[in-house]
Amino acid sequence: MSRLSDANVSIAKEIIGRYPRPKSALIPLLHLAQEQHGWVSNESMSHIAELVGVTPAEVYGTASFYEMFKFHPVGRYCIDVCTNISCQLLGAWELLEHAERRLGVRAGSTTDDGMFTLEDVECIAACTEAPAIEVNYRYRYRVTPDDFDALIDKLTAGRLGDEVPRFGTLARVRQRTTDRWSGAGTTAQAEVDAR
């Protein structure tokens, strides 16, 4: 997987400039890399390390602490099923088993058509609304197997519009940036569409 694109390097430098220490920008830069590629590769982590002046191991240490970063290619829709204690007590294991049957893959896998990646993840901080899932970082609460089936039907038919981003994973950094960055997503989208 490639390094950050030239357009995203410009964005990265602007992000880094917002912090008193470059290292403080690691998380938004990881989101930026994930948005560009759909996941965070070793090469992109090494590039981020160069940009902020730390080792690749420090970047990986930060990224691996969080469930939101993926270290392998994912499908168009990445479905994270929370199986932490609150969700477990309210049916997460049954929901995960149902999701595996419905999609025809085990957790940690992607469907043959590249449409869905199913992940079993730890806490997504939605304990009061368990069982909860995320689809490309958009939360779904109190999900039943029937709700899951309806969601998959809508995603397959393309009926959710802007509610769920079109590709891979969504960089939250775009949700918290200024308008002058808004055009940069076009480059990242073109790169993802090309894969």
Regions found by a protein language model. Give the residues of each.
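Signature of N-terminal electron-transfer/Fe-S-associated modules in redox systems
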Residues: 1-195
